[in-house]
Every structure is written in C-alpha cells, then in structure tokens.
C-alpha cells in the first residue's frame, strides 16, 4: 500500500484536525480487527505474540490492543520482551560480522525463561516478569513484576523476536501478529518517502529525545538493525495470523518539526550521509503539521513524547 503525497498535502491545507482524526480512526480500526482475531483464539491460548522491526510502534500497539480487549470485558496485559534480555558476557555474546556485540540477535534473549513463562501462564500459574536495566545493560530479577492470568485473561508479549521459531514455534496455539510501518508515500508513481525511512525517523527522534543518543550514533547502528531484520525478523513474518500496518499518513508532516534539526546536524563525514541527505530532502515535499494537533493517545507519541501512555 502507498499513500499519495498530493492527497496528504491537500488534506492538511483543508482541515488538518479532521485529517489527523480520520487517520487515527483508521489505526483504531486495525487495532479492533486485531482484537477480534485474538478473542477468536482465546480458547486455544491466552498468549499473544506481537513482532515487528525497530520503530514499528509495537509497544503502543500492544497497549492499545490490551486496552481494546479490556473495553470488551477481557482483562489483558502488555509485556515487553525486552525485559527478557540476558546480561551479556563479552566472552560469549553473539557478534556482528564486524566484531561488535550483536544486540539484534535472538541469542540475546532468555528463550528458556520465556518458554517456561508461557507454559506457566497457560496453566494459570504466577510468573515473575524480569526487569532489564538498559542504562546498566543488565537484567535485575529483583525488580521483577508478578503476573498471573485468570480464566479468560490475555498476555500480549511484544518484541522483535516474538515470532522466531524458538519462541512461536514452541507455542503454535498462541495468536501471532506482525507489525511494521509498511506504507511508502508516492507522488503519482514516484516514490517520495520510504516506509523504512518512517521507521528510521521514528527511532532517530525517540533515541535523541528520550535516550540521549545522537542521531549519528543511531545512523551507525541502523545498518546492523536492518541486517538483523533481514536475518532474524522478516523470515518469520509469514507465521503471523495478522499483518498490521502501523504507518500514519500524517506522521511525516509532523516529524518535520522534530527530525529535520537533528538530521541536519549529522557530521559531513558520516558514511551514511548520502542516504541521510535524500531523507532530509524528502521532507521538503510535505506541508508541515503542528505537533500540538497530535492526539495524546496517538501511536506517534511513542516517538515524539507528550502522550498518555507510560513507556519504560
């Protein structure tokens, strides 16, 4: 699917408030359809596995699906699989071809603990969800949170490796979702903004604003992120019961406000500056939208802040 640039700019000029509301409603309908599929699977399993590449909005989407399920009377919990990361020993950690620790590898996850927790939840037993401290790059089980599923309760586990065979393959009855910002933006038949650029922009803005990461560092990591997607995430997309497009037609016009200043600050000697310049120029095609118009519960708030959901 591709959005049309002319239509986006026309809607912004005509009535940006109405445009944003319609886009958010379309996203809400996708959430509702996902909830339908999950409920139809509840008798088979209380576990939902939600996967997708970096910058897809997995966290917000998991929380919104859980919210929709609760609205329908089914208590639900969103669980970040990032908390199941293992504390890495530099001597045994998986490595990229360049020799750095490969944080995109599924070997960084505690697969055995996840396996035990899924089985325990399905039996109605209590588990202790671990806590991974990213600032210290270590797991702290003493900060874990208890979770037990009562009858007809659901746990949504979201993470980049949720559909990996070593996870989903061991629990084939679980409902499975794959999410990504998949839609390009075209001007007629000419590509103006790639879906992968949307995800890179989301991540760059979030990392800069909330993780203290300079955009040059995000760009340096992006090549390995994309390599990890092709090796560890995309091959399992076909396992999903639902493919969920998390792109929003209004996000590029909003992101102009946040992304352009930080993208333009990247040093000229950065090896990815060529692609970066293409991305910077692409924003010129879009009318801007005031970020204040973005709803507090919008998925975009996961990346720009000021939202009604709490992110850890």
Q: Which residues does each PLM region occupy?
A:
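Charged, amphipathic alpha-helical linker segments immediately N-terminal to NTP-binding catalytic cores
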Residues: 1-36
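Post-Walker A helix-loop "phosphate-sensing" segment adjacent to the P-loop in P-loop NTPases
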Residues: 67-77
